[in-house]
């Protein structure tokens, strides 16, 4: 498995990243915990060292499952998780991080994303709190997900963005217009979600496929 540097950080992430949305059980049909644990073990055996999760994936269930599966190998892995909208106020950022660390059985998070921009909390509050936690060593890298270019520029007024996570695939290429060039110019890493078009690009769907 190839490894790449994550933007300007010292983190080395695998070229393929294991996602865990389905492991939360509330989207995409769900998955049995045993199957999820086996999938994580299979990823490790094939050289994947980076795992992406979030509180909203089963209200913490995917984080808890991942934390248990990575016991004993935590120091060899890169864990990505995300701050949900309810935890973006200044006084909620650190508790939100600490709750995620507890579920993941770790005392630091390698990459901590703002999952979605808030409609009510000024980004200055969230970014200032995240920068403090990064300075304290509790976060290795700060990311933003589902941000527009203007929202990224506003966030950068108050801190660092090490990585972005937009939806991006051969079918969904809107970031080519402005976000991707900006990220490249500023050495901001890009970890896309849904790179296989939520299954459409896997080759499993043939002409005449019936969607239900």
Question: Can you say where each PLM-predicted feature lies in the sequence?
Answer:
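N-terminal binding-site loop/beta-alpha segment at the start of enzyme catalytic domains
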Residues: 1-77
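A short, structured active-site edge motif that brings together acidic residues
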Residues: 76-88, 111-115
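CE4/NodB-like, metal-dependent polysaccharide N-deacetylase domain
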Residues: 93-113, 132-136, 157
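Short, well-ordered coil/turn segments that N-cap beta-strands
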Residues: 11-16, 47-49, 74-77, 106-110, ...
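Beta/alpha (TIM)-barrel catalytic core signal, keyed to glycine-rich beta->alpha loops juxtaposed to Asp/Glu
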Residues: 117-212
């Amino acid at each position: 498995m190839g490894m790449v540097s994550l933007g300007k950080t010292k983190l080395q992430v695998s070229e393929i990243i294991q996602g865990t949305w389905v492991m939360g059980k509330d989207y995409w049909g769900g998955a049995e915990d045993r199957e999820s644990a086996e999938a994580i073990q299979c990823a490790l055996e094939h050289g994947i060292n980076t795992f992406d999760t979030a509180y909203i994936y089963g209200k913490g269930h995917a984080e808890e499952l991942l934390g248990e599966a990575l016991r004993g190998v935590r120091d060899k892995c890169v864990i990505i998780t995300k701050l949900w909208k309810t935890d973006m106020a200044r006084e909620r950022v650190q508790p939100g991080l600490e709750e995620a660390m507890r579920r993941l059985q770790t005392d630091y998070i390698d990459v901590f994303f703002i999952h979605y921009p808030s409609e009510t909390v000024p980004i200055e509050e969230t970014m200032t709190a995240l920068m403090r936690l990064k300075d304290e060593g509790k976060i290795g890298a700060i990311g933003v997900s589902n941000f527009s270019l203007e929202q990224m520029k506003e966030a950068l007024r108050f801190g660092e963005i090490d990585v972005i996570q937009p939806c991006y695939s051969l079918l969904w290429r809107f970031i080519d217009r402005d976000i991707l060039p900006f990220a490249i110019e500023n050495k901001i890493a890009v970890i896309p979600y849904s790179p296989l078009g939520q299954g459409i690009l896997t080759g499993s769907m043939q002409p005449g496929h019936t969607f239900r």
